[in-house]
Curated annotation (Swiss-Prot):
ATP binds at residues 71, 76-79, 134. Gene3D superfamilies: Bira Bifunctional Protein, Domain 2 (3.30.930.10), CO dehydrogenase flavoprotein, C-terminal domain (3.30.390.50). The keyword Protein biosynthesis does not apply. GO terms for biological process: protein modification process. It comes from Salmonella choleraesuis (strain SC-B67). This is Lipoate-protein ligase A. Pathway: Protein modification; protein lipoylation via exogenous pathway; protein N(6)-(lipoyl)lysine from lipoate: step 1/2; Protein modification; protein lipoylation via exogenous pathway; protein N(6)-(lipoyl)lysine from lipoate: step 2/2. The gene is lplA. Belongs to the LplA family. Residues 29-216 form the BPL/LPL catalytic domain. One of its GO terms (cellular component) is cytosol. One of its GO terms (molecular function) is ATP binding.
Length: 338
């Protein structure tokens, strides 16, 4: 019986692909070696311990319909589009060894005519007249009896968009958590004009087969029908949830301030697991009562634009004379936390 398994996703949904990865990883026999190939449409993927409000321009992402996906491995934030090819290698212990999967990817690149080297813990780089340029980044996860190595290969990614989403607004945000390190990157199309996702997948697959001396047929994973994977529906629901993607952020504090025609406002939030644990409101408004009431309404709310906006508007019934001010405040607050 073969010990290899090859899976290829035809979905561009990051939550679907990460849920597939998680399910395969949890249920694979310890004797199996798995290669999973996939790619995502416009997505910022953050590490397990990262804070999306600190790492990303969440407002710009929402405007441009870019998804946020939190992965189960550590490391930094990356932007995925269809110019990235994603790979995941899985194996049971003691056989799991990320140097083996790194060797397979390097062999695949070599077969395409690209000489790359491993650099540091996570990157593959190519030498250019301008110095080393990163063409692949990776992250890893291990449990007691198994491990995986997943990463991306930059084929024809829109590198100009990296800065759009991975540079957060200059918010007054004091946050804990892992900060991403920006690297100089290059697309493989600069070295191999016309290279395609399919060609790269084929090269990685052949290198995978060659290393283990076996061949297997590919299993195509599609969202058109629920994959036959244990607990997939529950895993997908969690992977796509606000509670996982945003709510798992490390604790942080956020200060918002604005001056309106009716007075200045400062909001101080402490946020844990995506929920406001403390809210303070300061104002020089001549009628501070609605704002004092707002602090109590916000405590315990999810740190979401729509939730905060609704909490503010809910005070209109209690303070109808300040309807205009409360609507203005609600709109500003929703925009400020996006």
């Amino acid at each position: 019986m073969t010990t290899l398994r090859l899976l290829i996703s035809d979905s561009y949904d990051p939550w679907f692909n990460l849920a597939v990865e998680e399910c395969i990883f949890r249920q694979m026999p310890a004797t199996q070696r798995v290669l999973f190939l996939w790619r995502n449409a416009d997505t910022v993927v953050i590490g397990r311990a990262q804070n999306p409000w600190k790492e990303c321009n969440t407002r710009r992402m929402e405007e441009d319909n870019v998804r946020l996906a939190r992965r189960s491995s550590g490391g930094g934030a990356v932007f995925h589009d269809l110019g990235n090819t994603c790979f995941t290698f899985m194996a049971g212990k003691p056989e799991y060894d990320k140097t083996i999967s790194t060797h397979i990817v390097l062999a695949a690149l070599n077969s395409l005519g690209v000489m790359a080297d491993a650099s540091g813990r996570n990157d593959l780089v190519v030498k250019t007249p301008d110095g080393d340029r990163k063409v692949s980044g990776s992250a890893y996860r291990e449990t007691k009896d198994r491990g995986f190595h997943h990463g991306t290969l930059l084929l024809n990614a829109d590198l100009s968009r990296l800065a759009n989403y991975l540079n957060p607004d200059k918010k007054k945000l004091a946050a804990k958590g892992i900060t991403s390190v920006r690297s100089r990157v290059a697309n493989l199309t600069e070295l191999l004009p016309g290279i395609t996702h399919e060609q790269v997948c084929q090269a990685v697959t052949e290198a995978f087969f060659a290393h283990y001396g076996e061949r297997v047929d590919a299993e195509v994973i599609s969202p058109d029908k629920t994959p036959d994977l244990p607990n997939f529906a529950e895993t997908f629901a969690r992977q796509s949830s606000w509670e996982w993607n945003f709510g798992q952020a490390p604790a942080f504090s956020h200060l918002l301030d604005e001056h309106f025609t009716w007075g200045g406002v400062e909001l101080h939030f402490d946020v844990e697991k995506g929920v406001i644990t403390r809210a303070q409101v300061f104002t020089d408004s001549l009628n501070p009562a609605p704002l004092e009431a707002l602090a109590g309404r916000l405590q315990g709310c999810q740190y979401r634009a729509d939730v905060l906006e609704q909490a503010c508007k809910s005070l209109i019934a209690e303070f109808p004379a300040q309807k205009g001010e409360l609507r203005e405040l609600a709109a500003w607050m929703a925009q400020a936390v996006r």
